[in-house]
Amino acid sequence: MLNSSTNNTSSPIINSIETTDIEEKYRKYYVPNDLYWGIGIENESYFMLDKTIERTGEYIKKNRRRERYSVDYNTSYDQEKLTNYLNKLFGDRDLFNIPQYVNSHTLSKTDTQGEHRTLYVIGQKNNPKYSGKSLHELFLETNNLYQLDFNHKYVFDGDTIEFITQNFYKTTVNDCVNELIMYKNKFVNDMNILMKKNNLPLLSFPKINFGLVHFRTNPNNIGIFNNGTYHINLTMPTKLNSQGEIADPILFEKRHKNAIELIKWIEPLIIALYGSPDVFSVEDNQKYSKGSLRLTASRYVSIGTYDTNIMKKGKQLNDLKDSMYLYLYDKSWYNKIYQQTDYKQCDHIGYDINYAKHLNLGIEFRILDYFPEEVLGELIKFIVLILDHSFETKIDLQSVECKEWHDFVCDALINGNTVIVPKELGLIMNQFIGFPLIKHNMSIKKYMKKLSKFLHKKYANSLCSRNMSPNMQVPKIYNINKYMWENNFLQYIPINNKNHLKVLKLYHIYSDLKSDKITFDPENNYHSILVNSDLLQESELDLDTFYEKLLKISNSKIPINKYIL
């Protein structure tokens, strides 16, 4: 265990943080001389409408300009190569169901008729058709409670609506996740009262990170990079002094630094199973990310970028890539992946972790793409076990110093849930961070289940686990990456062309499996879709019937419970 420092007096390491309004907001929670721990969730989300909108393949290919208020994510792609790929996958006359999204700009900058506050012209010019009040302003007028909640329990962060749990102090994982779920449900229900009153379509939250969507504020284009996110805030059990501040700031930083080092080691393990793939990672010859589009782009978040040699405090979003180790080290996963794929590097690289972002806060873990909330608690419990492991294991080798780690990050981002954990990396993780030994290459799915059982057996009643998740069972591991890939694959099957490349390939595999011409391969994405959709259980289907059933599944989606490992 990492022991206390010899000096338990107050130190400027934590207490020199500038006092601000937001610091005072958190100060009121802390009980003097208490043993404190913290758990918080920040969830960036969109709304979606119940009805999709039909668009042709030609429309999708020709109309991909950014929304007026948002970043141009098209710059993350080599456009010439992407155009060639899209011509292969989207026939001009093919018709697709495109989800309709509502973002923060719809709420804050448009009225009930969809009119923008300003015209889309050079300079700020008011729109004469604008009614004078945005959807959000009307929402606040009819819901006084939300006037207090705005900028506390929810904020507009970029184009997303971000929900922030408040009861972080000595809470549990289950209570924290339930707080998020309950508040989001209340929010959308109250929002729908306003929508119904104004004869507007009702809202819901997406359960999938859809790769191609139609934003209400950008009606003539198709939007990409549409992922929701989670940021998980975790502070390990810590003694407070008589002022309600960290009693031993040196030890606090030492312990959280060690935990950050360990978390960086497991980031690619998590992303391989919980990341959301690029919608274009179909028949792409590994040119687009099956692991996590957002992390591959690394615009606002990345892998392994927080520098524990400095332990900078406060909020960090990104920095110029010329100042980042990932870019300067030519053998890094970042440089390697851009040599292999058809993406283009951005000018900035994001941070995976923040430290001491607020008063007495430990770690903000920033890399998670959104997935259904019912899965979130299990993953946070797994991370809590990792925190306990960091109490007992000093991490002497940084992940970013390990070539095998960089190679694995690259493989995980390209291949997602089909990536293999090499025995060489397994040996290194056994020797330097105390993970279980593997003698052979192992699938990421088997390795994560093995690791979850190992950590639970060793730490289920240890300091972090017994306080942050009492009576914890072995955390369930989900293959969210496959859930996202398969449902995106199904979403963008044309609704008017049974002879499309994706349909025919899937049908031929179905026929060959039914006739025993080929053997089922659980690592094959097409085989997996047939199993998880229950199509493989169907009797001999002709192409017409197969296509009809495929479209029904595309509309209803494959449920998350199919992806428990």
Curated annotation (Swiss-Prot):
Name listed for the protein in its UniProt record: Uncharacterized protein R704
UniProt organism field: Acanthamoeba polyphaga mimivirus (APMV)
